[in-house]
Amino acid sequence: VKITDKKAAYITGIWSKLDKKVTTAHALERVFTVYPWTTRLFKSFNGHFKAGDSGVQGHAEKVVGALDTAVLHLHDIDAGYKKLSEKHQLIGVDTQNFKLLGQAFLVELAILFKEGFTPELHEAAYKFFLAVAGGLSSQYH
């Protein structure tokens, strides 16, 4: 997925306006609720998958860090995700989960920005999360 300079500007603009940890925790809760099988690698959460729960908050911090890296390297997300991709493969994360989280983020962005989440912003965010999913899947074999 190629991120154009125009889309990169949209992405950095969106990312700068978010309460990143809150938005990420809500996106994670949405994934865990809609796709309950995604919780299988989070046994330490003891069945607590709400945005405000400590396990979700802790994982949200990690996801925010990974997304911060992607935003800083929009034109080469794969390179920044090599080790993280290897780690996710090692622990057995299904690559489809990355796409599901991206879809949940799109819902959260639409809820947050309402009419401000224009088709152009939606397209940029969609491509960003597709690129992130690709980067996180890049070392799977």
Curated annotation (Swiss-Prot):
The keyword rRNA-binding does not apply. Red blood cells. Residues 2-141 form the Globin domain. GO terms for molecular function: haptoglobin binding; heme binding; metal ion binding; organic acid binding; oxygen binding; oxygen carrier activity; peroxidase activity. PROSITE patterns: GLOBIN. Heme b binds at H59, H88. GO terms for biological process: hydrogen peroxide catabolic process. GO terms for cellular component: blood microparticle; haptoglobin-hemoglobin complex; hemoglobin complex. Pfam families: Globin. InterPro entries: Globin (IPR000971), Globin-like_sf (IPR009050), Globin/Proto (IPR012292), Hemoglobin_b (IPR002337), Hemoglobin_oxygen_transport (IPR050056). Keywords: Heme, Iron, Metal-binding, Oxygen transport, Transport. Gene3D superfamilies: Globins. Heterotetramer of two alpha chains and two beta chains. Involved in oxygen transport from gills to the various peripheral tissues. Belongs to the globin family. PANTHER family: HEMOGLOBIN FAMILY MEMBER. This is Hemoglobin subunit beta. The gene is HBB.
